[in-house]
Amino acid sequence: MFGKLGMKGAAVSVAALCVAMLSAGCNKLKARDHLVQGENAFKTGQYSQAADEFNLAIAADPTFGTARLYLATAYMQQYTPGTDTAENKKFWQTAMDQFQTVLKDDPNNLLATQSIASLYFNVGNAKGPDSAENLAKAEEWNRKVIGIDPKNKEAYYTLGVIPWLEFLTPDREARNELHMSPEEENPLKPDAKKSTLKADLKAKYWQPLTDGIENEKKALAIDPQYENAMSYMNLLIRYRADLDDTKEQYTADVKEANDWVEKALETTKAKAKAKADAIAAGASPTE
């Protein structure tokens, strides 16, 4: 008697397990279907609809990491840097939260790490009250990108852009205080009333600007035709020249900066010509 009851109980357990497995399988199929629908909406720029579909995919299968990554990306696409609205802040924060959730399960996810770096950079570059803090976070996360992908030229490029952004406003303010126009081709002048102004700026910004130059060089070592890095070589060297001690040093640095401008222009023209030639030859153009 007990044997029959035991067999019946086992049969019930097996049946319940089968139902659970079928249900899990159905949920995964639902999740996949919502993912595809979300991808289609995303490709046509319907980011809000895409986010809805990705949310449904996660609801059907909470372990679906790809859907969560796509959801975060859909929210990030709806964020507009510099727009100070509650909705825009929500897009930024939701994207950030979802990318962070992705990293809890997959700490070395490159796309999530790059996206967090980008979110911090964009909000920092918007010049809000927390700009300096967010740019520092952007630097931290771009270094994490390099830790995952040492050949990531965009991360090195951004590490070069950040110190220039941080120096831009103080440099302009210093020129104004020293009665120098932005176009005046001289390093910052000593001033009896503001005797420590230049020294203070040099102590704070010289090394970060120099590090920025080195990071752009690393980006160019990865891609010698990276014209964006060339453009920031120009800006970093040109602005750092304001901290030079002599007119001779300044002139030499400005010449080097101008050389980078020319190289960037030549590279851009060469790429455009190569692309046009490829199209004319019937080939698929590449970047």
Language-model regions: role of each:
Residues 32-56, 60, 81, 198:
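Alpha-helical segment of the N-proximal tetratricopeptide repeat
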